[in-house]
């Protein structure tokens, strides 16, 4: 029994799920379309990156092969140059949705078997009784927004009015979310968190997966930008996840990035929440290297920038550059694995930056598994993300639960 490192590349999907058409996402392919865009020069940006997508280490682990198995097409430049060094496959989500919470819970062995509540794409989006209760219980002068919106666009549109009136900006999307944006200094982080806590309780009867605090800074002259102090208020999982089972067995767990928020801080062990992909990966590798992470321990990290900074913003060059930066760190990840350790790299949904709109895309996800002594080769199609949690449970010496291990 040794340790495990689970890395979720937030939104790095590899092709439309079998039911993508019912979500309006037939043909979506995050990795494939980024690679194709880069191959024809559409991923170039002066001072950032140029040319074809270069992911030699991920390709060697089987990313291109997994994408080809999922879609029937090898993304340009992602065929492995030599022998494959990882066990690779692709997974299909059983939960109905394409959101962060459903994806992560299913990875951890708890597929969502109910429909999340969502707010309609009308204006207003929120039920009047919900809005009125939030205003009254949180002591607000009112709210702004009350619609479906892009988070970056709505703070540009309403940021100055938010500062002037003190009314927070409340908005949603096709996901099961209630998002609240307010100026970090004029409104205050503590007050924003308190308002979100009220909204979390009020949203429970509507089966809303997350209430998200979206602080921003800036002014009307310079523009407004979101800060790294985002906080998610998620509903807790309906049954025991892999994390619950590990903690119950006395195993060490380290949660990096927004993992603690996603699992409502239940059985998430030691939580570390740096800002950005690089800092989150640094923290995960540091935690994995510590002697305190003994046998049976898990480090679970989400790298959110792929989604928030590039997917939602439909930024192909930015997304490509972020993938290349992560790829360059694969040798470092490998070097941190001791004999018996296991690393799994996967994703929670797609967010194709070439797709219409600004929302997630319903996609299959890569499953890349490697470590000293692990035999490379195909894992095939995994019919649920829960197979990932099952494999980790088997590796960490826990009895089987939901899903089917490949180990």
Curated annotation (Swiss-Prot):
Instruction: Show the Gene3D superfamilies listed in the entry.
Output: Alkaline Phosphatase, subunit A, Phosphopentomutase
Q: What is its main location?
A: cytoplasm
Q: Which domain of life is it from?
A: Bacteria
> Which residues take part in binding Mn(2+) 2?
307, 312, 360
Q: Where does Mn(2+) 1 bind?
A: 10, 348-349
Annotated InterPro entries: Alkaline_phosphatase_core_sf (IPR017850), DeoB (IPR010045), Metalloenzyme (IPR006124), Phosphopentomutase_DeoB_cap_sf (IPR024052)
Give the pathway. Answer: Carbohydrate degradation; 2-deoxy-D-ribose 1-phosphate degradation; D-glyceraldehyde 3-phosphate and acetaldehyde from 2-deoxy-alpha-D-ribose 1-phosphate: step 1/2
GO MF, one annotated term: magnesium ion binding
What is an annotated GO biological process for this record, any one? metabolic compound salvage
Q: How is the cofactor bound?
A: Binds 2 manganese ions.
Q: What is its EC number?
A: 5.4.2.7
- Cofactor (UniProt): Mn(2+)
Entry keyword Isomerase: yes
Its function? Isomerase that catalyzes the conversion of deoxy-ribose 1-phosphate (dRib-1-P) and ribose 1-phosphate (Rib-1-P) to deoxy-ribose 5-phosphate (dRib-5-P) and ribose 5-phosphate (Rib-5-P), respectively.
Protein family: Belongs to the phosphopentomutase family.
Name the UniProt record assigns to this protein: Phosphopentomutase
Source organism of the structure: Methylobacterium nodulans (strain LMG 21967 / CNCM I-2342 / ORS 2060)
């Amino acid at each position: 029994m040794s340790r495990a490192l689970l890395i979720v590349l937030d939104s790095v999907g590899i092709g439309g799920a079998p039911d993508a058409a019912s979500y309006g996402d037939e043909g979506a392919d995050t990795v494939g379309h980024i690679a194709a865009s880069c191959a024809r020069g559409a991923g170039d940006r002066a001072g950032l990156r140029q040319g074809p997508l270069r992911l030699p280490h991920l390709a060697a682990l089987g990313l291109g092969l997994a994408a080809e198995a999922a879609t029937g097409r090898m993304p340009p430049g992602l065929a492995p140059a030599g022998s494959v060094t990882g066990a690779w496959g692709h997974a299909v989500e059983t939960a109905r949705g394409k959101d962060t919470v459903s994806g992560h819970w299913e990875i951890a062995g708890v597929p969502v078997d109910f429909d999340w509540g969502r707010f309609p794409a009308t204006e207003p989006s929120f039920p009047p009784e919900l809005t009125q209760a939030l205003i009254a219980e949180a002591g607000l002068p009112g709210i702004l927004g009350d619609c479906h919106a892009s988070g970056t666009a709505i703070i540009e549109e309403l940021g100055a009015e938010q500062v002037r009136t003190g009314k927070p900006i409340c908005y949603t999307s096709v996901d099961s979310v209630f998002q609240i944006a307010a100026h970090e200094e004029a409104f205050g982080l503590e007050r924003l968190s308190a308002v979100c806590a009220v909204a979390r309780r009020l949203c429970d009867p509507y089966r809303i997966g997350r209430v998200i605090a979206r602080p921003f800074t800036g002014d009307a002259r310079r523009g407004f930008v979101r800060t790294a102090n985002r906080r998610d208020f998620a509903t807790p999982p309906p049954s025991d996840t892999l994390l619950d089972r590990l903690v119950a067995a006395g195993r060490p767990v380290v949660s990096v990035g927004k993992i603690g928020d996603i699992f409502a801080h239940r059985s998430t062990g030691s939580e570390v929440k740096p800002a950005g992909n690089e800092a989150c990966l640094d923290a995960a590798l540091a935690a994995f290297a510590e002697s305190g992470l003994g046998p049976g321990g898990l480090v679970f990290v989400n790298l959110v920038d792929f989604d928030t900074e590039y997917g939602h913003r439909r930024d192909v060059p930015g997304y490509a550059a972020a993938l290349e930066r992560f790829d360059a760190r694969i040798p470092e990840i490998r070097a941190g694995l001791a004999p018996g350790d296991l690393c799994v790299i996967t994703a929670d949904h797609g967010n194709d930056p070439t797709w219409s709109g600004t929302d997630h895309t319903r996609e299959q996800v890569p499953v890349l598994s490697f470590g000293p002594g692990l035999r490379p080769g195909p894992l095939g199609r995994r019919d649920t993300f829960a197979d990932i949690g099952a494999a980790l449970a088997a590796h960490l010496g826990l009895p089987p639960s939901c899903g089917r291990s490949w180990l």
